[in-house]
């Protein structure tokens, strides 16, 4: 994919900026594809990611811990857990160590919905990956690792 150098200079001042902008745009396009695919199983990407964390932990976790693992702020996680709870995918339980805190626990329906979403996400990601040659993939992986 060629860089879109027809964009106004407002977006970038040199090739490095153009590459960074192209990377962000590519990420948005992949995320949109994942979002569309997950809609078919009744999930958003945010819900799927939260369920992924909860399923992988296999124990109730605090909302602060969930926020940390999702790399977002606690208030966003509170709203996300509200939506997950309304859908019956997560339940809040009291934290035995801190009466002021609650933990999020994935429900059986949440596990089932996550299990339905995982192959959908995998298929989208595989489709994206197969568009890259093995050499392109190695170069891109090194470049993305450097950004972190």
Question: Where does each model-flagged region fall?
Answer:
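A short beta-strand-loop micro-motif that forms or neighbors metal/cofactor-
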Residues: 144-148
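Charged, amphipathic alpha-helical coiled-coil/dimerization segments
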Residues: 5-6, 31, 62, 82-142
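Short aromatic/hydrophobic contact patches that present stacked aromatics
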Residues: 20, 69, 103
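Active-site phosphate/pyrophosphate-handling residues
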Residues: 18, 49, 138
């Amino acid at each position: 994919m060629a860089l879109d150098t027809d964009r106004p200079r407002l977006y970038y001042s040199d090739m490095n900026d153009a590459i960074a902008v192209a990377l962000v745009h590519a990420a948005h396009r992949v995320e949109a594809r994942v979002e569309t695919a997950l809609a078919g199983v009744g999930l958003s990407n945010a819900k799927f990611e939260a369920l992924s964390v909860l399923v992988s932990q296999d124990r109730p976790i605090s909302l602060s811990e969930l926020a940390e693992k999702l790399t977002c702020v606690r208030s966003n996680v509170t709203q996300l857990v509200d939506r997950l709870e309304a859908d019956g995918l997560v339940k809040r339980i009291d934290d035995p160590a801190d009466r002021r805190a609650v933990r999020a626990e994935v429900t059986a329906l949440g596990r089932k919905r996550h299990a339905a979403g995982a192959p959908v996400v995998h298929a989208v990601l595989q489709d994206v990956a197969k568009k890259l040659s093995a050499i392109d993939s190695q170069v891109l992986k090194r470049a993305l690792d450097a950004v972190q």
